Amino acid sequence: MREIVHIQAGQCGNQIGAKFWEVISDEHGIDPSGNYVGDSDLQLERISVYYNEASSHKYVPRAILVDLEPGTMDSVRSGAFGHLFRPDNFIFGQSGAGNNWAKGHYTEGAELVDSVLDVVRKECENCDCLQGFQLTHSLGGGTGSGMGTLLISKVREEYPDRIMNTFSVVPSPKVSDTVVEPYNATLSIHQLVENTDETYCIDNEALYDICFRTLKLATPTYGDLNHLVSATMSGVTTSLRFPGQLNADLRKLAVNMVPFPRLHFFMPGFAPLTARGSQQYRALTVPELTQQMFDAKNMMAACDPRHGRYLTVATVFRGRMSMKEVDEQMLAIQSKNSSYFVEWIPNNVKVAVCDIPPRGLKMSSTFIGNSTAIQELFKRISEQFTAMFRRKAFLHWYTGEGMDEMEFTEAESNMNDLVSEYQQYQDATAEEEGEMYEDDDEESEAQGPK
């Protein structure tokens, strides 16, 4: 079966990772000690994608937990599903990265990385036919961003033909832990552009707004934010974990979603978003789900899709519903809002339907959009980065770990290039294709709309 190896790095990565395993274990009928207690064959049909069946008929997650300090991992271990994980797969240092990307990427993280790769190798040898890796991490701290991107490039070196997929939590000034987040995020994005195949941008700012505006929570906690993340991650991975009509594996998803290799940053969304207690009073209809799912307020990245255009979209509907109705609704959305979909990729919206809804809901839908509006997120980080970098504020923490200012300049310009690439395809139309070749220089010709 096509297995996926899951890696979680740093405090944020371990917290959303642990929540992800709680949610999907529940969906697959696996109790905290790894025994199957479910009631449907569908739960077991593709269980081997994320779980390894041990000799004692216990199911063990194909998960590797990494951090540069023991704190978060201790709380995962003592949490509800802490005994599910393989004890050898907890790998941690003692020193911490101190929210410093350079420590995670070059000094502290580099010392720990070989022992992580040993465990990665062992997990991959347990697989019949590995399809790829998924990493959960944040871009604002030191370990998830610095060591996370180091792991990506090391794993990529060793498994160059496997898909690399990340769930990356992007920092926001509204929910800020550290003042150097823009530095860490820019240095990380510089790596993600080159080394991953698919990156889901999960934006704390958007999560906060959802909790505050839609769920009416006065003081959202990280627990509330992670609850949204785990719902989204569960939805995004549905077609990998359950048999469905559009049977996606990571590679098929990439083929459908990524028109140009650098533009692989997705905006996830989820519906229904209702406060936790108020769901049961009325069932949602397919039109309502479709409407909600395309709404800017439901996006997990703080970008307004109406400010850009969709290159590609994938959606997953869960629950018992009519395929015909789903197709009709999706077509209706596209024809009503045709200006928001680029016309030079026909049929750029793909729909999967899975019969098993998430716990507590009759139906739900998950949205994955590759929209040019994601440039707003990169612009936001870039502006904050430039404000500090112009004054060389806090740079000594990074140069002290052996980094060079040059690396910052490169990361900054790579991110700005990414923004202008998104802009280029936002403006591109099917007609002007011929003209673009004549007046552009060779470089953009190589990347121009084919």
UniProtKB/Swiss-Prot annotation:
<dbReference type="InterPro" id="IPR036525">
    <property type="entry name" value="Tubulin/FtsZ_GTPase_sf"/>
</dbReference>
<dbReference type="GO" id="GO:1990890">
    <property type="term" value="F:netrin receptor binding"/>
</dbReference>
<dbReference type="GO" id="GO:0046872">
    <property type="term" value="F:metal ion binding"/>
</dbReference>
<keyword id="KW-0479">Metal-binding</keyword>
<keyword id="KW-0597">Phosphoprotein</keyword>
<feature type="modified residue" description="Phosphoserine">
    <location>
        <position position="444"/>
    </location>
</feature>
<feature type="binding site">
    <location>
        <position position="69"/>
    </location>
    <ligand>
        <name>GTP</name>
    </ligand>
</feature>
<feature type="binding site">
    <location>
        <position position="226"/>
    </location>
    <ligand>
        <name>GTP</name>
    </ligand>
</feature>
<feature type="binding site">
    <location>
        <position position="204"/>
    </location>
    <ligand>
        <name>GTP</name>
    </ligand>
</feature>
<dbReference type="GO" id="GO:0045171">
    <property type="term" value="C:intercellular bridge"/>
</dbReference>
<dbReference type="GO" id="GO:0030175">
    <property type="term" value="C:filopodium"/>
</dbReference>
<dbReference type="GO" id="GO:0042277">
    <property type="term" value="F:peptide binding"/>
</dbReference>
<keyword id="KW-0966">Cell projection</keyword>
<feature type="modified residue" description="5-glutamyl polyglutamate">
    <location>
        <position position="438"/>
    </location>
</feature>
<feature type="compositionally biased region" description="Acidic residues">
    <location>
        <begin position="429"/>
        <end position="450"/>
    </location>
</feature>
<feature type="binding site">
    <location>
        <position position="11"/>
    </location>
    <ligand>
        <name>GTP</name>
    </ligand>
</feature>
<dbReference type="Pfam" id="PF00091">
    <property type="entry name" value="Tubulin"/>
</dbReference>
<dbReference type="GO" id="GO:0005200">
    <property type="term" value="F:structural constituent of cytoskeleton"/>
</dbReference>
<dbReference type="GO" id="GO:0030027">
    <property type="term" value="C:lamellipodium"/>
</dbReference>
<dbReference type="GO" id="GO:0071944">
    <property type="term" value="C:cell periphery"/>
</dbReference>
<protein>
    <recommendedName>
        <fullName>Tubulin beta-3 chain</fullName>
    </recommendedName>
</protein>
<feature type="modified residue" description="Phosphoserine; by CDK1">
    <location>
        <position position="172"/>
    </location>
</feature>
<feature type="binding site">
    <location>
        <position position="138"/>
    </location>
    <ligand>
        <name>GTP</name>
    </ligand>
</feature>
<feature type="binding site">
    <location>
        <position position="143"/>
    </location>
    <ligand>
        <name>GTP</name>
    </ligand>
</feature>
<dbReference type="InterPro" id="IPR008280">
    <property type="entry name" value="Tub_FtsZ_C"/>
</dbReference>
<dbReference type="InterPro" id="IPR003008">
    <property type="entry name" value="Tubulin_FtsZ_GTPase"/>
</dbReference>
<dbReference type="GO" id="GO:0030426">
    <property type="term" value="C:growth cone"/>
</dbReference>
<dbReference type="InterPro" id="IPR000217">
    <property type="entry name" value="Tubulin"/>
</dbReference>
<keyword id="KW-0206">Cytoskeleton</keyword>
<keyword id="KW-0493">Microtubule</keyword>
<feature type="binding site">
    <location>
        <position position="144"/>
    </location>
    <ligand>
        <name>GTP</name>
    </ligand>
</feature>
<feature type="binding site">
    <location>
        <position position="69"/>
    </location>
    <ligand>
        <name>Mg(2+)</name>
    </ligand>
</feature>
<dbReference type="GO" id="GO:0043025">
    <property type="term" value="C:neuronal cell body"/>
</dbReference>
<dbReference type="InterPro" id="IPR017975">
    <property type="entry name" value="Tubulin_CS"/>
</dbReference>
<dbReference type="GO" id="GO:0038007">
    <property type="term" value="P:netrin-activated signaling pathway"/>
</dbReference>
<dbReference type="GO" id="GO:0007411">
    <property type="term" value="P:axon guidance"/>
</dbReference>
<dbReference type="InterPro" id="IPR002453">
    <property type="entry name" value="Beta_tubulin"/>
</dbReference>
<dbReference type="GO" id="GO:0005525">
    <property type="term" value="F:GTP binding"/>
</dbReference>
<dbReference type="GO" id="GO:0000226">
    <property type="term" value="P:microtubule cytoskeleton organization"/>
</dbReference>
<dbReference type="GO" id="GO:0003924">
    <property type="term" value="F:GTPase activity"/>
</dbReference>
<dbReference type="GO" id="GO:0030424">
    <property type="term" value="C:axon"/>
</dbReference>
<dbReference type="GO" id="GO:0030425">
    <property type="term" value="C:dendrite"/>
</dbReference>
